[in-house]
């Protein structure tokens, strides 16, 4: 009996798909296109269910410091050694999804957004080590991790986290925001 490759139904995590041997349509050429047509901000618009979330996960896996480069073995992008040497695993990455911010009120949306910020900030605990950040920076970071955020802190939370990561790593930060339109759609729906 022939062995079948598993289909990744409902799986939007690039690392899981590659590690667990799921069928994967190689879209790593998008990384090359992105880098060859670099912009300060890049917006990817496609209809629902066109793989945007999986592509965001792929971008994170490619760019993030400490990435497992074996995830890309045998894929299109691995043939471009110069590009991989220059960019793979070289950047701090903030990756959030606003899919869960589907609240029916401002207060509930704020609470959900705060949770997303807290979870992402926790992913970067390494910045508390060493002396690259001063005590004020570390206190700002801890306010993001603990959720001890006033309105202004929450509004500027991504900018703050980006600045702290940039200071710690001395590199530009890649920020990936998936489902960015969900809070806007819910706000429009609920007035």
Task: Please place each PLM-identified region on the residue numbering.
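Walker B catalytic acidic pair
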Residues: 178-182
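Conserved P-loop NTPase mechanochemical-coupling segment
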Residues: 9-18, 101, 108, 112-155, ...
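Alpha-helical scaffold elements adjacent to nucleotide-binding pockets in ATP/GTP-utilizing enzyme cores
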Residues: 33, 46, 50, 54-62, ...
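Conserved helicase/translocase P-loop NTPase motor core
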Residues: 151-172
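Walker A/P-loop-proximal flanking segment of P-loop NTPase domains
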Residues: 1-80
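P-loop NTPase motor core
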Residues: 10, 15, 26, 61-126
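Short loop/turn elements that form and flank the Walker-type P-loop nucleotide-binding site
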Residues: 37-38, 89-90, 169-171
